[in-house]
Amino acid sequence: MNKQDYIDGAESALLHTYNRFPLVIDHGDGVYLYDTDGKEYLDFAAGIAVQAFGYNNKEYNDALKAQIDKVMHTSNLYYNVPIMNAAKRVFKASQMNRVFFTNSGTEAIEGAIKAAKKYAYTRDGHAGHEIIAMNHSFHGRSIGALSV
């Protein structure tokens, strides 16, 4: 398939959530992305600033493969070893003693709203109703996140 075939296929098959650049990524290595024509690009976007791991990092890939061989994902209904190990690393690197892991920024915003309301209720006897946020900023696609 050529570049235009990929673009046409994506336009007809994928929900149009963003205006995309006419660039079809084939693979990445380090901080670079490569298109289907082999052209190299320095990746400044990094998953729109939420996944700045780079590409094809051997240490990261090996750790990911080792974890996938054990367990890739479980529900929050269960306790699991990897999440406790991750929590301990966060505690060691910070002054926190409790952590809330999520799968997305939207879930982080929703969790922050709920935590703030719970805090206000515990402190004042009623849930707070005002949220301070950056104007015209992206907070996620859920109803709660869109309301911020």
Residue ranges of predicted features:
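Glycine-rich phosphate-binding segment of PLP-dependent enzymes
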Residues: 41, 47-77, 87-103
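PLP-dependent aspartate aminotransferase-fold enzymes
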Residues: 89-148
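Short clusters of small/polar residues that mark proteolytic maturation junctions
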Residues: 45-46, 147
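Active-site-adjacent loop/helix segments that line or gate small-molecule/cofactor pockets in enzymes
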Residues: 1-29, 77
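Active-site and channel-lining beta-strand-loop segments
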Residues: 22-43
